């Protein structure tokens, strides 16, 4: 399923989706992936954890459509793919404190200084992510750009996230970690991946 929304659409709390109706029992453990790309993580997650529901938001329509089609072909009823900007969609789709986890893998680092304001992990988005998570909920952030990772950990800790590895520190790969399509390439070549596992207290 592909979903889009106009940029100026109002936030109508009474119209928030009934995720339990959409996903059944899996809707009781709702997780979000921002930026699904080619869908390696989303597909792997949905297969590995059928008891959990994943909503993926991908801004590129082609990628979103392809991933949705793959999910349908594999009968992954616990996966829903939406097309749009997560900064606009997330507050219209999820109630505060409703997500068990949010996954942000390899977001665009926007290298040029004048483009830094386009980075996903800015002050406003960091606060939004914290607000959407339930107490004890986890933000799973990964990047191949060390500088971006170091800037992100400072900003995310400042808005109130607790760093499970310790202040300013990066996490090790979890035993049940599902790699994204892009991450597999880095792991195969031995290049480092910078991970954050941040918890809402």
UniProtKB/Swiss-Prot annotation:
Pathway: tRNA modification; N(7)-methylguanine-tRNA biosynthesis. Its EC number is 2.1.1.33. Keywords: Methyltransferase, S-adenosyl-L-methionine, Transferase, tRNA processing. Belongs to the class I-like SAM-binding methyltransferase superfamily. TrmB family. It comes from Anaeromyxobacter dehalogenans (strain 2CP-C). Transmembrane segments: none annotated. One of its GO terms (cellular component) is tRNA methyltransferase complex. CDD domains: AdoMet_MTases. The gene is trmB. SUPFAM superfamilies: S-adenosyl-L-methionine-dependent methyltransferases. Gene3D superfamilies: Vaccinia Virus protein VP39. Substrate binds at residues 112, 144. It catalyses: guanosine(46) in tRNA + S-adenosyl-L-methionine = N(7)-methylguanosine(46) in tRNA + S-adenosyl-L-homocysteine. S-adenosyl-L-methionine binds at residues 33, 58, 85, 108. Catalyzes the formation of N(7)-methylguanine at position 46 (m7G46) in tRNA. One of its GO terms (molecular function) is tRNA (guanine(46)-N7)-methyltransferase activity. The active site is at residue 108. This is tRNA (guanine-N(7)-)-methyltransferase.
């Amino acid at each position: 399923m592909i979903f889009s929304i106009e940029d100026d659409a109002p936030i109508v709390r009474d119209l928030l989706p009934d995720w339990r109706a959409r996903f059944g029992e899996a809707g009781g453990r709702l997780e979000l992936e921002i930026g699904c790309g080619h869908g390696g993580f989303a597909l792997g997650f949905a297969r590995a954890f059928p008891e959990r529901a994943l909503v993926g938001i991908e801004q590129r329509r082609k990628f979103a459509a392809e991933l949705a089609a793959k999910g349908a072909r594999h009968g992954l009823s616990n996966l829903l793919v939406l097309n749009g900007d997560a900064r606009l969609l997330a507050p219209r789709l999820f109630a505060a404190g409703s997500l068990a986890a949010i996954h942000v893998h390899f977001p665009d680092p926007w290298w040029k200084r004048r483009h830094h304001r386009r980075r996903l992990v800015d002050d406003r988005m960091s606060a939004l992510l914290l607000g959407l998570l339930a107490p004890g909920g986890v933000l799973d952030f990964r990047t191949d750009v060390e500088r971006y990772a170091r800037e992100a950990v400072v900003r995310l800790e400042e808005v109130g996230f607790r760093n499970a590895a310790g202040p300013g520190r990066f996490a090790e790969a979890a035993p049940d970690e599902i790699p994204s399509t892009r991450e597999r390439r880095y792991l195969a070549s031995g290049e480092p991946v910078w991970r954050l596992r941040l918890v809402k207290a």
